[in-house]
């Protein structure tokens, strides 16, 4: 695939400074780029690379003023990082466009409806009564249970398992190894010390423009739905339990765990290895730092929380400053105790 710089500038709403007829066929980091590739400069600390890069073109901010001569063409845009993301999306779409049709062997159940321009990879299984939209790509060895609905422009990568009755919106991406709709962790303790399995009869509903990383598990609801709203971005290796609700445009980093029946607000940021207990609510625009433990409802919007149990950022920093001084404080206390004992001894004599 080749694109001229003029074509790329038109896509980005930018302006070419250099040879607009030059062609690029690959994308690379600025420090590793070769002739025929395009890169970008967004972070000023990488500016030195633009003077030595072999890239045929670099996307830069409109007000960029080079301090040295350049051997590469420039594409001037408002936001280089966002523009480069647009390039990556276009490149990926062009690659995916080559995947079309139904590979054998694969299985499609009774009364399944599959839209146009689809791709179904080898050994994929699509259950009965599924409704699959247009431009959907289902890669090899994916499993789609009965009565599943999948919206347009959605990609299901190899080895994904989607249990029966789940619903996926438009432009959803689910990476390899994900399990959507498995049983929630529901067991009733019995008088004899054993546990009785509670049937999980709900489903998972995933909105539009949701991305889910590899090996993440989203459990079905006990009753009703576990819901992932529009725009949510979920990293690899995350556990989302039964009846959880995650609000629009929330992002969750790897190895986080959210316990059952918890509701996460909109535009939250949940960092890696965060643990959240069940049956609580997290307010909109909450930021939770890595490895924090949330054990209570967070009602106030916009807080940043750290530590386990998590507390507000300023309180955590104050507490941590004291924590770091504990060895010194202990030594001072011991010295004061010794002085006190000595003074007591003098008074007694």
From Swiss-Prot:
Its EC number is 2.3.1.191. Pathway: Bacterial outer membrane biogenesis; LPS lipid A biosynthesis. It is an enzyme of class 2 (transferase). SUPFAM superfamilies: Trimeric LpxA-like enzymes. Pfam families: Hexapep, LpxD. The keyword Signal does not apply. One of its GO terms (biological process) is lipid A biosynthetic process. It catalyses: a UDP-3-O-[(3R)-3-hydroxyacyl]-alpha-D-glucosamine + a (3R)-hydroxyacyl-[ACP] = a UDP-2-N,3-O-bis[(3R)-3-hydroxyacyl]-alpha-D-glucosamine + holo-[ACP] + H(+). The active site is at 242 (proton acceptor). CDD domains: LbH_LpxD. One of its GO terms (cellular component) is membrane. GO terms for molecular function: N-acyltransferase activity. Keywords: Acyltransferase, Lipid A biosynthesis, Lipid biosynthesis, Lipid metabolism, Repeat, Transferase. It comes from the Bacteria. InterPro entries: Hexapep, Hexapep_transf_CS, LpxD, Trimer_LpxA-like_sf, UDP_GlcNAc_AcTrfase_non-rep. The keyword Repeat applies. Belongs to the transferase hexapeptide repeat family. LpxD subfamily. Catalyzes the N-acylation of UDP-3-O-acylglucosamine using 3-hydroxyacyl-ACP as the acyl donor. Is involved in the biosynthesis of lipid A, a phosphorylated glycolipid that anchors the lipopolysaccharide to the outer membrane of the cell. Homotrimer. This is UDP-3-O-acylglucosamine N-acyltransferase.
């Amino acid at each position: 695939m080749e694109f001229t710089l003029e074509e790329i500038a038109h896509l980005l709403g930018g302006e070419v400074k250099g040879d607009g007829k030059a062609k690029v066929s690959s994308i690379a980091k600025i420090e590793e780029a070769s002739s025929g590739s395009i890169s970008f400069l967004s972070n000023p600390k990488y500016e030195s690379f633009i003077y030595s890069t072999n890239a045929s073109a670099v996307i830069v901010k409109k007000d960029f003023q080079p301090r040295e001569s350049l051997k590469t063409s420039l594409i001037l845009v408002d936001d280089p990082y966002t523009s480069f993301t647009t390039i990556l999306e276009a490149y990926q779409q062009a690659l995916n466009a080559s995947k079309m049709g139904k590979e054998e062997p694969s299985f499609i159940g009774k009364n399944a409806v599959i839209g146009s321009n689809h791709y179904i990879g080898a050994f994929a299984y699509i259950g009965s009564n599924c409704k699959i939209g247009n431009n959907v790509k289902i890669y090899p060895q994916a499993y789609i249970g009965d009565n599943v609905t999948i919206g347009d422009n959605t990609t299901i990568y190899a080895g994904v398992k989607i249990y029966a009755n789940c619903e996926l919106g438009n432009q959803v991406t689910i990476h390899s190894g994900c399990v959507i709709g498995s049983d929630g962790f529901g067991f009733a303790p019995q008088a004899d010390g054993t546990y009785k399995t509670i049937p999980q009869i709900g489903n998972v509903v995933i909105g539009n423009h949701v991305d889910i990383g590899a090996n993440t598990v989203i459990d079905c609801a006990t009753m009703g739905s576990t819901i992932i709203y529009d725009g949510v971005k979920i990293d690899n290796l995350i556990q989302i339990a039964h009846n959880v609700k995650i609000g629009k445009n929330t992002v969750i980093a790897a190895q986080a765990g959210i316990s059952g029946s918890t509701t996460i607000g909109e535009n939250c940021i949940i960092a890696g290895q965060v643990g959240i207990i069940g049956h609580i609510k997290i307010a909109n625009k909450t930021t939770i730092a890595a490895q924090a433990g949330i054990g209570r409802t967070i009602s106030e919007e916009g807080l940043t929380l750290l530590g386990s149990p998590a507390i507000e950022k300023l309180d955590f920093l104050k507490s941590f400053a004291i924590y770091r001084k504990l060895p010194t404080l202990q030594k001072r206390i011991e010295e004061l105790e010794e002085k006190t004992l000595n003074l007591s001894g003098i008074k007694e004599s």
